[in-house]
Amino acid sequence: MGDGKGADALDKFWKRVKKYGAKIEYVATDLSAAFISAVKKNAPQAKLVFDHFHVKKQIGDAVDKVRRSVYHDKLYEEKKDVIKGARWLLLKNSEDIKTESAKKQLEEALRVNEPLAKAYYLKEEITLVWAQPDKNAAREFLYGWISRAIRSENRHIIKAGKGMFKHREGILAWYDHKITTAMVEGINNKIKVMKREAYGFTDDRYFKLRLLALHDAGITPFL
C-alpha cells in the first residue's frame, strides 16, 4: 500500500519488484502521464495496456467540454435548456438510456446542435475499438476514428483524437492481453465506502490493518 495518488505512491512497490526480480510483462493502467512514466522507468520491458473505461472517459470528458462550449455560444442561446438538461444523457452509453422521454431529450439536444452531435457519435463509436475480431481490424477502426475526430473541426474532439493517436499502441495492446484496471477500481471503491462509513480515520496504522483485512471472510467495509 502506498500513500497518495501520485506515481511516488508506488515507490515501495517498485523497490519490491527489483528486490525479488519480478519480470512484469503487461501493466493495465489509466492514461495518467505520471504512472505511464513510472512503468517505463521501472519496468521498461512491460507492455502498457490502457484500460478501456479510462479511454472512454477521456472521450466523454471531451464531449462534455463541447457541450459546455456550445452552451455558452450565442448561436444556441434559445436552446440552452435543452443542451444543459442533456448532460448526463450525453455521457451515458446509448444502451443504458431506457426511457422514451430520455431518448427524446437526447435526440432533441443532438438535433439542435451539429458540433455536439458529431462529438456524441464519435464517443459512441470509440467503444467499437474493443469489439473487433482481431487486433488488425481494431487498428484499422481506431485509425479511422482518429481521422474522423481530427477532421471534426472542434478543438476538444481534435485534441481527444490526437490523444488517441498518441496512446494507440497501449489501446490496441488489449488484444494481446485482455487485462483491465476493473479489479483495482473495485478495491478503491470499497476503500471509499470504508472511509465514508467510518467518517474518516485518524489512525493511519489502524486504517492499513483494516485494508489488509478487507478481503477476509466476514469482514465488511464498515466498522
Range-by-range predicted roles:
Residues 11-45, 53-57, 76-223:
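Acidic/histidine-rich catalytic cores and adjacent linkers
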Residues 49:
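General small-molecule cofactor/ligand-binding pocket signal
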Residues 1-8:
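Glycine-rich phosphate-binding "P-loop"
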Residues 55-76:
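Short alpha-helix plus adjacent loop in nuclease-associated cores
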